[in-house]
Amino acid sequence: MTRRGSRTLKVDFTAGQLTHFGGIYLLHRFLQQLRFRTLLSQSIRLTEYHHRYSISERLLALVYPMILGLENVELTRLLGTNGVFQYLTGLPQFPRPNTLRRFLIGNAPTLLPQSRHVHNRLRRHFLTLGFSTSSYWLDFDSTVKTLYGHQEGVVKGYNPKNKGKKSYHPLICTEGHLGDCLGGELRDGNAHTASGVKEMFIKILTFLPPVRSLRIRADAGFYDSGFIEEIQKNKASFAVVAHLTRPLKDRLVGLRYKKINKVQSTAEFDYQPHGWRDAYRFVILREKLTEKRKEQLKLFTIEAHAYHVLVTNLSLTPFGVFTFYQDRAGMERIVRILRDDYPFGTAPTQSFMANALYAELSLLAYNIILWFQRLCLPPDWQSYTVETLRHRLLLIPGVFTRTDNRPLLKLPKNSLYQDIFLYADKKIHALNSLGF
């Protein structure tokens, strides 16, 4: 007997009170429990008259789509027709994309510094919440976001994957243990990698909780005397990849190397680079190359050896310094997440300041998800990516009904993650408000 699908099924677009975003209830409850909207309302001031949406409503209307993975402002239209989402998040009639763009363009110079100030207060709060440490590790990096159009600041610059293409060149700082983004700044596409890093470091110090030690890691783009002097001035430790200038290269061959294993050996020396005020400790990791390894590396080589060089003030052994630096791989993963899973570094408007505000809000969206994950989800969910969290918890279908005149959100009874949902809801209920 031949089996066929139904030939008589009818389709009717009449169902109401449905949503793709049933799981956003958890994020809404998380922010509600913290009294996040109250914090925005009390901390961010803007002179306006008779606007349909409050400042906090428009800021959240920008942040929520970022959390859900909607890639640009235009896609917020999807939420404008979703009454259940609007009810769950307390956003009556979601603002239109043009409304949000005008909000960014018209108010960015006023809102950006205030938003950063609020974000920094939140960063300090969540660094100390549920986590105890005697040391923070700050990782600095930059990324490139290729863009098309004529937006302010989108110019040709360092863009190794798309050479000759225009881009922004944002700067980022994260904490090495937790992954929190402690700073981010949109920059012109032709900005030097180290441009603004000293100022960002100084700003982070103003809200970083006191600890016994502070360590900084950065790649060769941040091999900058001003940055390193500022680190020294603040009694912090650092490991920064050195530029292999000719004087440095000339020193590598004549050193006495200590063998670590069959392929690696280390050495060190003190050296004052040209134009620097002081001499610093330089540590070298020499690696014996196979033919396969030669193809993988883009490092300075001499006689079948590759040389990795760090400038540091750490008291660790040379190999210990490299072990510490190599733990920085987590930063590269975070950069990819910000670039690929959030709209960090994109250009929703032609205005640089408006796009910088949008970038700051995307970092806030990233941190909100991270804080929610750390405080409200089980230990075995701590390593999950934002894409997995969206798929398993946030983007689950729901039906909104009323029972005994009380609102009820119905989620699928066969959900694989019902226990996780209830676990998170219980954890949220136990949280204290921000109390700023």
Regions found by a protein language model. Name each.
Residues 2-9, 13, 237-340, 398, ...:
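An anionic, glycine-rich sequence signature occurring as long contiguous blocks
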Residues 225-229:
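Catalytic cores of alpha/beta
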Residues 79, 141, 184, 217-219, ...:
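Generic beta-strand/beta-sheet core signal
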Residues 1-165, 169-209, 234, 396-436:
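Dynamic "connector" segments at or just before major functional cores
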Residues 213-223:
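Acidic/histidine-rich, metal-coordinating catalytic segments
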Residues 77, 93-94, 214, 376-386:
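Short, glycine/acidic-rich hinge or "gate" loops at secondary-structure transitions
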Residues 30, 76, 144, 318-361, ...:
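Short amphipathic alpha-helical "interface-anchor" segments enriched in bulky aromatics
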Residues 42-50, 318-325, 341-357, 373-384, ...:
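Short, solvent-exposed helix-loop connector elements
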